[in-house]
């Protein structure tokens, strides 16, 4: 089996999908992250597709290396990895269809019957009270965890940050038995991240996500070493 063509389609102007077609008539479908979909389209069509055409999509590890090699001229992160991720998903979809197996079986099989989920707020324009009311609405629907996005990404230690006020209001609204997760998308210096983290510990926050920009791994390590709260990161790498 060989890859015969690749399509990149943006649905409703926001949702990018890739379709990998093969010479045996089987198609794999993958989804890309929605940020700057037209940039990703160029990467997929101009860089990644030539690296895949005519090759066996079932050899997913080799095809991943082909794509990574094709994208070496670009910096880590961004559109190159968004494109690679979507195409990798599509090739796994193909593999599952060919073998007539769900992907989880190809990745080692089922290890649990269910996975806990949390509600997530992507809005950063809510007042602390509005965020608290939103969190409560999800708790009333049965969620036992709520993740809020706060601070001002791209502006380190911005004075408009309301993280602590917001988490305080959310904790008051949902009580002590609900997990609160906080994601600031790299908006703090090391020193300020530690200050904020200690306050989040006092508020019983479940985890503190991306206190430092993704490229500052030493700084992230310093924050993690100074705090007891679990530090989450890695989605931007």
Annotate each predicted stretch with a short phrase:
Residues 28, 180-182, 231-232:
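Residue-level marker for buried hydrophobic side chains located in beta-strands
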